[in-house]
């Protein structure tokens, strides 16, 4: 699957996550609009690793999200939205 992230979100995600997350990304390319297109084999694994990053780096001692956690949640939501859109499009193409 391919996901389109702003360059800022992509760099933030890479800086605030474990090495395993960058290992799940097969390919990246910068788009004309400055966004980054990332390709992954397993979108579920990518989302799981982002969740791990929220827990490891984005929560305070009382498990409330910090600014890092909120930004990681935003990126998680964006990728999940794009994943659902792609799956819906594939489902509609298969039914035609």
Question: For each of these PLM feature ranges, what is it?
Answer:
Residues 2-41:
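N-terminal acidic leader/helix
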Residues 10, 76-83, 87:
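Long amphipathic alpha-helical segments
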Residues 20-22, 30, 55, 67, ...:
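General N-terminal targeting signals
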Residues 32-80:
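Acidic, low-complexity, intrinsically disordered interaction modules
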Residues 86-96:
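Short acidic DE-rich linear segments
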């Amino acid at each position: 699957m391919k996901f389109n992230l702003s360059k800022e979100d992509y760099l933030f995600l890479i800086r605030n996550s474990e090495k395993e997350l960058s290992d799940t990304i097969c390919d990246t390319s910068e788009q004309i609009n400055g966004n980054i297109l990332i390709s992954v084999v397993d979108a579920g694994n990518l989302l799981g690793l982002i969740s791990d990053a929220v827990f490891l780096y984005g929560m305070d001692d009382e498990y409330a999200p910090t600014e890092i956690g909120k930004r990681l949640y935003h990126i998680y939501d964006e990728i999940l939205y794009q994943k659902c859109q792609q799956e819906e499009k594939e489902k509609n193409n298969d039914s035609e």
